[in-house]
Amino acid sequence: MQFSKITLAIVLYALGTAALPTASRCAGAPGRDVAATRGAKLQAREEDKPTPQYRCDKCEKEFVKGNDFFNHGGRGHCKMSGY
């Protein structure tokens, strides 16, 4: 009885992994961008990039993180503008 449960589990696992999509299967599928080569570097799409939340009034530079903005000299103390 135990042997048949183990065999059944292996068969179900094999069927489940065979049904999952792989990079080679998805490469030709419409609407799917899949990197199927080794060492490929993925870059964020334009809509995935974070939008800047902070902007320096003096030099017009935009920042995503508040720490970068305040280290830059935000709130009127811009280090880039020479003030």
From Swiss-Prot:
InterPro entries: Znf_C2H2_type (IPR013087). Coiled coil: none annotated. A zinc finger (C2H2-type) spans 54-77. Its main location: secreted. GO terms for molecular function: zinc ion binding. One of its GO terms (cellular component) is extracellular region. Residues 1-19 form the signal peptide. It is found in: Secreted; Host nucleus. Induction: Expressed during multiple necrotrophy, the late stage of host plant infection. The keyword Protease does not apply. Keywords: Host nucleus, Metal-binding, Secreted, Signal, Transcription, Transcription regulation, Virulence, Zinc, Zinc-finger. The keyword Cell membrane does not apply. Probable secreted effector that translocates into the nuclei of host cells to reprogram the expression of targeted genes by binding on effector binding elements in rice. This is Host transcription reprogramming factor 9. It comes from Pyricularia oryzae (strain 70-15 / ATCC MYA-4617 / FGSC 8958) (Rice blast fungus). The gene is HTR9.
